[in-house]
């Protein structure tokens, strides 16, 4: 798999070639990580582009080949050569999948509907219990007690539900160290081999936490 770099990326990676293969890119990223531990890989790798290997000759790209980008993209998707590209948004822990966002919204709506139904059942059950427990009282007093109980239960359940939604996420204890590990697998059609890039960023909130030994 071949990757086209921007001028800024070439400068930062100290590379004089416009295109590099997967192994070269992995090696240069490791070296860059050693020199600059505060680098934001999400921003840095945003402009990396995949190019077909047959459009590269002696390390140079034919600038007119950009007109074939749509066709090239379709071919690459069919050949499943995007193994290394989905990591670009995920390296910062950001999900760009609209399908996942849609599922999250549907899940939230489902939870809200379930909460409303549960609150209604609680109110109806409370009113029914109060009505039968006060059978010896007059109708006016029974109605007043039922109304008071219904309002009290409704306010309490609504308060608890809103409190639950606004609750802060649980924080990890101080005896944990935060560690994030990114794994990048590149399938290079030229070399027919795989290599993994593991980058540890200690200062960024973790996707995987490990206890202090």
Curated annotation (Swiss-Prot):
The chain crosses the membrane at residues 113-133, 142-162. Its main location: endoplasmic reticulum. GO terms for biological process: vacuolar proton-transporting V-type ATPase complex assembly. One of its GO terms (cellular component) is endoplasmic reticulum. InterPro entries: ATPase_Vma12. It is found in: Endoplasmic reticulum membrane. It is a multi-pass membrane protein. Keywords: Endoplasmic reticulum, Membrane, Transmembrane, Transmembrane helix. Required for vacuolar ATPase assembly. This is Vacuolar ATPase assembly integral membrane protein vph2. The lineage of its organism: Eukaryota, Fungi, Dikarya, Ascomycota, Taphrinomycotina.
């Amino acid at each position: 798999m071949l990757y086209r770099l921007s001028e800024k990326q070439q400068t930062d990676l100290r590379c004089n070639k416009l295109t590099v293969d997967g192994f070269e890119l992995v090696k240069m990223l490791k070296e860059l990580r050693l020199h600059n531990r505060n680098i934001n890989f999400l921003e840095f790798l945003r402009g990396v582009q995949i190019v077909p290997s047959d459009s590269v000759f002696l390390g140079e790209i034919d600038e007119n080949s950009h007109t074939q980008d749509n066709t090239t993209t379709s071919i690459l998707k069919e050949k499943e050569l995007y193994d290394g590209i989905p990591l670009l948004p995920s390296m910062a822990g950001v999900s760009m999948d609209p399908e996942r966002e849609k599922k999250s919204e549907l899940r939230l709506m489902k939870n809200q509907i379930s909460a409303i139904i549960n609150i209604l059942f609680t109110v109806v059950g409370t009113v029914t219990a109060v009505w039968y427990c006060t059978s010896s009282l007059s109708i006016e007093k029974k109605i007043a007690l039922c109304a008071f109980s219904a309002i009290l239960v409704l306010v309490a359940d609504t308060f608890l539900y809103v409190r639950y939604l606004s609750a802060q996420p649980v924080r990890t204890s101080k005896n944990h160290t935060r560690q994030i590990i990114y794994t990048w697998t590149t399938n290079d059609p030229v070399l027919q081999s795989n290599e993994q890039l593991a980058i540890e960023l200690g200062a960024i909130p973790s996707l995987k936490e490990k206890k202090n030994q």
